[in-house]
């Protein structure tokens, strides 16, 4: 095949301000100095084995908490919780809000559970609480925080899953998640989506 003869006219190079091309939204809970829990809506994460890598913005309460207390819970909401997530999307748990965040509308709010209409659950071994309304809650330990030399706006946080909690309605055969029952909340270019119908599965699927 001569790739030089392929028609490329239906494509156009653009320069989007954001690269949120469709990933799972999650609510990261971390421990405040006074022992209370902070909730941070996020969408940058990926998993490999039992390790979950998080992209966490600098200047916020989440990274401050993770640097001081290396535990967290990765709470995964379903599409029905998008409004709860959005209620706290413009809040920061940090009193001294960075100028850039303040400029785009962020304000201070400590009681995020109340603001979001969500309920705390005690975790099994970590100090930050889990979120009852989220069908999946992953207690995790921070293994490493890396500040890239090429970018000063975020940290790459490597975590190890310690305990994986799932709502009984989405569990299949004891230790599997039923893909037909579980739909994550997807953050797609700053819009919220659920999943559509299944189109297929990988050869390694056990369900």
From Swiss-Prot:
Q: Which UniProt keywords apply?
A: Flavoprotein
Q: Which cofactor does it need?
A: FMN
**InterPro entries on file:** Flavin_Rdtase-like_dom, Flavoredoxin, Split_barrel_FMN-bd
Alphabetized SUPFAM superfamilies for the sequence: FMN-binding split barrel
Q: Which GO terms describe its molecular function?
A: FMN binding; oxidoreductase activity, acting on the CH-NH group of donors, NAD or NADP as acceptor
By sequence similarity, the record places it as follows: Belongs to the flavoredoxin family.
Alphabetical list of PANTHER family matching this protein: FLAVOREDOXIN, FLAVOREDOXIN-RELATED-RELATED
This chain's protein is named Uncharacterized protein YdfE
Q: What is the gene called?
A: ydfE
